[in-house]
Swiss-Prot record:
A Pfam family this chain is assigned to: PTPS
Catalytic activity: 7,8-dihydroneopterin 3'-phosphate = glycolaldehyde phosphate + 6-hydroxymethyl-7,8-dihydropterin
Keywords for this protein: Lyase, Metal-binding, Zinc
Cofactor: binding comment: Binds 1 zinc ion per subunit.
Organism from which the protein derives: Pyrococcus furiosus (strain ATCC 43587 / DSM 3638 / JCM 8422 / Vc1)
Superkingdom of this protein's organism: Archaea
Annotated protein name in UniProt: Dihydroneopterin monophosphate aldolase
Amino acid sequence: MKARIIYRASFDAAHAVKIEEWEELHGHTFSLEVVVEGEIKKGYVMDFLKLKKVVDGVVKELDHRNLNKIMDNPTTENIALWISERIRKNLPGDVKLKRLSLWEGNEFGVELEW
């Protein structure tokens, strides 16, 4: 039987994005929710603490940073894709990233699904 487990994290970072023109550099508290799926083996999908370590390791790269120095045009969508690529590389082979939600403050967010 498959199950999904969920981990939430947050980080503070600054960015400037280009929609039609470049915005001014500004900051947000980003909220992240990661959902992974796998078979229940020995009573669990993946040790919660291992999932926390994977996600927190990625979040640490972004926390209190200027995201424009890490990626081009750090829109919330691009930040979510960047995070997802790094999480996927560090999950056990039998556990898959199914959903990632990233909120920019309390009003706007993006959700990726696989």
